[in-house]
């Protein structure tokens, strides 16, 4: 490879690593602790923060407007200023030269202060929400700290797939198992997010296991209750008359109908064998929000266990349809139900929340049906809910480990100290023993570490104590490649070759020795990553990444620096060890 091509490869690799590392550097070093804590909070907490911040800002703004303040408004009202400019442009009015509180409020097409607040609050809330969610996305791209460094709980969960595959043909079992595990992952994620836990790590491990990390949570009993809870889905008939009566009562008495938990204060408002359930939808935070209520029969008309499949399709007008199939018993029950209850609504209830309440338009006797009236996203959510009823897999906790936050902080200090001291010791030895050539080795070592962190960030891997151990080992192993190259160059110089010829021959002679040792190490790391679990995997990943990056820096970066000294600086000698070799 030519020197220009080699230089281009090095630049491309370093530029790529810079791009991969940017979110990590920005998250850990350029973001203040308060912003990081806010981004790591649950979506419920983010929503509360955005709503409260928007209400506080609008209260300050309206107070200044009432007082007739002549001061320029704060930059945090920039979204409102942009909307105000747009409103003034549409109405043909000029924008003011200075934006005061009164000028901003008067730019909106509302007649009262309350109307302005209702108009402006979504804009301000969106600004705060997007700022936090942007940091949350950035954190997801940064190198994450494992539980041994940050504290929390890790759980290995085994899914019992025997019931799911019972009676399924052998040719279809693999697909059913895969789909069941995908739904297990989705169910666990929804369940953990519902409890307001921040940034959980949920990933499949093997064929029938799931690995879960919950940072900051060290209560074993709470973890067990969150993970092991099982969802329930069923179809309930809606009592439309009772719903209308309760709705009329609610309109006349909105504060006294429900308590803070959305439970009725007066149970006599609905018939005895019914219950009031909320209708829920996903908001802009990805959270379930209550959007009305329905009175439904307590006894389910059809249990979710009878659902055998659910898919999303398109109707004649290209509108999303949710198609579902029932087993033999479910088909019989559903046929009788839909024949008898034409015109009534059938609520689909998942975990006590109504996801949909379609009307029964005609008898469904074929054991399959369709539900319409959704957006594409809502149809996908309903499909997932229906399939989770069919693939309701029993879960069992196989292993659970808890690491305290103080232990995590101490691990960070110890791991960082070991990495820094190990690197410094290696760099010092190379400088003292190999002198000028040692400078090249030191630069290569620093770039080696830089590339390793870049690759960790690129693949969204987690940094653990075992990963740090792998890095420390890699630093020591990377020296070996440089030592082999330096010794070969010294041998060539002893034969009387010039600096350029000795460097070229030295790298050529050292190439296969370096490749042989590193390829065998890489193969060992590959087997450890495939067969190992937990800390062994972390060690194997960092070792494999380090092997590749150390070979790259030894053969590309170090060679480039030698060539630079020869051809650009016109050096005639090279100092390797305690001798100076001359032409």
Curated annotation (Swiss-Prot):
Keywords of the record: Cell inner membrane, Cell membrane, Membrane, Protein transport, Translocation, Transmembrane, Transmembrane helix, Transport
Residue intervals passing through the bilayer: 7-27, 419-439, 446-468, 469-489, 511-531, 538-558
Localization terms from the record: Cell inner membrane
GO biological process: intracellular protein transmembrane transport; protein targeting; protein transport by the Sec complex
Record-level Gene Ontology MF annotations: protein-transporting ATPase activity
Signal sequence range: none
UniProt keyword Amino-acid biosynthesis present: no
Main localization (coarse): membrane
SUPFAM superfamilies, per database record: Multidrug efflux transporter AcrB transmembrane domain
Keyword Acyltransferase: no
Any single Gene Ontology cellular-component annotation: plasma membrane
Membrane topology of this protein: Multi-pass membrane protein
Binding partners and assembly: Forms a complex with SecF. Part of the essential Sec protein translocation apparatus which comprises SecA, SecYEG and auxiliary proteins SecDF. Other proteins may also be involved.
The protein's role, per its UniProt record: Part of the Sec protein translocase complex. Interacts with the SecYEG preprotein conducting channel. SecDF uses the proton motive force (PMF) to complete protein translocation after the ATP-dependent function of SecA.
Protein known as: Protein translocase subunit SecD
Source lineage: Bacteria, Pseudomonadati, Spirochaetota, Spirochaetia, Spirochaetales
